[in-house]
Amino acid sequence: MAKRDYYEVLGVERGSSEADLKKAYRRLAMKHHPDRNPDSKESEEMFKEANEAYECLSDPNKRAAYDQYGHAGVDPSMGGGGAGFGGQNFSDIFGDVFSDFFGGGRGGQRGGAQRGSDLRYTLELNLEEAVRGTSVNIRVPTLVNCKPCDGSGAKKGSSPITCPTCGGIGQVRMQQGFFSVQQTCPRCHGQGKIISDPCDSCHGEGRVEEYKTLSVKVPAGVDTGDRIRLSGEGEAGTQGGPTGDLYVVINVREHSIFQRDGKHLFCEVPISFVDAALGGELEIPTLDGRVKLKIPEGTQTGKQFRIRGKGVAPVRGGGAGDLMCRVAVETPVNLGRRQRELLEEFRSSLEGDDSHSPKTTGFFDGVKRFFGDL
C-alpha cells in the first residue's frame, strides 16, 4: 500500500510552521496512543503513521528533502537520494512532545511509574463573586487508584510480571533498513509489565473513574481566563507515579449593569433631558452600594464621569480601579397633552437664539458651507 502524504497524515498545510506541526502531532498522539487504546490495531497503526510523519517533518533537512522528492527523498528503501533518518533515536525526537502528558520527557514514555494527567475544570462565577472572592465546592470526574489492587491492576495475591518482550523497558527497537527506531512495546503497550491475573474491579487498569468533591478558594479580583492550580488533584499516576494537577479556569458571567475591563468597571446611566439640561444629583449603583453623583447642567449624551476606587482590586495586588459612568440622555416618550404644550412653548422660546445648542448650530452651518462649495 502506498504511503499517505505526511502533511495529510498530520492534517496540516505544506507551509505550516513548526509549532503547527507539533500541535497537530500532539493531538493525534494523544488520541491514538497505545496506552489509551490497548486493543485497537487501527489506533496503533495511526499512532505509528503520525510518529513517522512528525519525525520527518520536524527535521528541517528531512522536511526539505521530502518537500522536493516526496517519500523517496527520506526513505532509503525507496531508492531516493535523500538524507534518510540516519539512526536517530526515536525517543530523543519525541521526548519533548510527550513531556507534558506522560510524566516529564523521555523517562515517562518508558515502562514504570508515569505521572497522572492534569485536569481542567471551568468555574462559572458572577461578577460579585469574582470581585470579592468566594469559596465554591466543585464535583470533578477523575481517575483514582483502584483500592482492591492498590493501583497495581493485578488481582489481590498476584503481581504483574516483567514483560519478556521489552525486558520491562516499555520500548522495543525495530530495525528498518539502515536505521533503527524505538517504538512502544506491542505486548505491554509501554507499561513494561504484564498482568496475567487482572483485578476484577479495574480490569487490570489500576485506576477507576470516580467523582471528587473539592473546595476551591477563589481569591478576590479574579477575571475570566485566570487559573487556580490545585496540586495533586488531577488523575492518579500509573504504577505508583505521582498524581496530576487540577486547573480551575475562571469564567465570569456577563453582568446586567456593569462591564469590566481589567480593574475598571463601566456602566451606562440613563438620565432625563431635564436633568441633563438643569443638572441634578443621581444615585449610582456600585458593587459596594449606592453613591451620589452630581450631574452639572448642560450635560450631553456620552459624557463620562469617574467614581474613583469603585472598580476592582486586581488579584495580583495594587489599588482598586474606578467606576466609569457614561451618561445617556433619554428622550421622553408617551407625552400627554399638557407636556406637549410645554415643550412646544420651550421650542418657541429657543427660536433665533443659537447659543443654547452650539453643536446643532455648528453642524448645520457646516452643512450650508458644504453645499455652498459644490
UniProtKB/Swiss-Prot annotation:
Q: Which coenzymes or cofactors are required?
A: Zn(2+)
Q: What function is annotated for this protein?
A: Participates actively in the response to hyperosmotic and heat shock by preventing the aggregation of stress-denatured proteins and by disaggregating proteins, also in an autonomous, DnaK-independent fashion. Unfolded proteins bind initially to DnaJ; upon interaction with the DnaJ-bound protein, DnaK hydrolyzes its bound ATP, resulting in the formation of a stable complex. GrpE releases ADP from DnaK; ATP binding to DnaK triggers the release of the substrate protein, thus completing the reaction cycle.
List UniProt keywords, sorted A-Z: Chaperone, Cytoplasm, DNA replication, Metal-binding, Repeat, Stress response, Zinc, Zinc-finger
**Similarity section:** Belongs to the DnaJ family.
Q: Which residue numbers delimit the J domain?
A: 5-70
Transport listed as a keyword: no
Q: What is this protein called?
A: Chaperone protein DnaJ
Task: Report the locations given in the UniProt record.
Answer: Cytoplasm
Cofactor annotation comment: Binds 2 Zn(2+) ions per monomer.
Q: What is known of its domains?
A: The J domain is necessary and sufficient to stimulate DnaK ATPase activity. Zinc center 1 plays an important role in the autonomous, DnaK-independent chaperone activity of DnaJ. Zinc center 2 is essential for interaction with DnaK and for DnaJ activity.
Which residues are recorded as binding Zn(2+) 2?
A: C163, C166, C185, C188
What is its quaternary makeup? Homodimer.
Q: Which residues bind Zn(2+) 1?
A: C146, C149, C199, C202
